[in-house]
């Protein structure tokens, strides 16, 4: 989140190194490529790019193309939080898949965890279905590129005591995430 404060807050990523990618192709680009080519050469078949919105898209487009010249089957997965950028990261930057955190995950989380709307009113089944449907319609032709999930290193597990309270409450979100779209995972 580009925090450079001497007094960072609890949600600031002060411990994350800020890499200077420059305005155009730099030595940093070449070093990053060397790292990915090294690991691809060792048999790594995919790379998950965390918070890719904080990395210049020009760099990511170049990097993906360069890696795929030597390892065309390597998969690139992006964590993108702004849904309005999903299409750009697939069609223009070249990512193979995106995590649908801001869409389906957040919708299912609201249904499971709160079961209330922003005003504290109970969410009826039709309201939950409407949110899921809206997300599905928003994705449209991007659905095959979306990876659905119920947990990751940044989020609480759906089946945890801090989240759904009861593992059986995760069955419906699991089925929705598995069968809602045509993603391969």
What are these regions (language model features)?
Residues 22, 79, 102, 150-152, ...:
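Structured loops at beta-to-helix junctions and adjacent beta-edge loops in soluble globular domains
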């Amino acid at each position: 989140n580009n925090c450079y404060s001497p007094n960072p807050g609890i949600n600031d990523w002060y411990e994350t190194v800020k890499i200077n990618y420059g305005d155009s192709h730099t030595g940093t680009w070449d070093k990053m490529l060397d790292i990915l080519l090294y690991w691809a050469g060792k048999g790594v078949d995919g790379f998950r790019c965390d918070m890719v919105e904080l990395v210049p898209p020009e760099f990511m487009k170049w990097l993906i193309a360069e890696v795929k010249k030597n390892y065309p089957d390597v998969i690139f997965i992006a964590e993108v939080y702004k849904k309005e950028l999903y299409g750009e990261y697939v069609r223009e930057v070249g990512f193979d898949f995106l995590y649908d955190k801001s869409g389906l995950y957040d919708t299912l989380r609201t249904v499971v965890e709160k079961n209330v709307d922003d005003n504290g009113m109970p969410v009826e089944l039709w309201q939950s279905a409407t949110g899921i449907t809206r997300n599905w319609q928003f994705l449209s032709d991007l659905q095959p590129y979306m990876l659905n999930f119920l947990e990751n290193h940044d989020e609480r597990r759906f089946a945890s005591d801090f989240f759904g309270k009861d593992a059986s409450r995760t069955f419906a979100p699991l089925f929705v995430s598995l069968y809602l779209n045509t993603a391969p995972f």
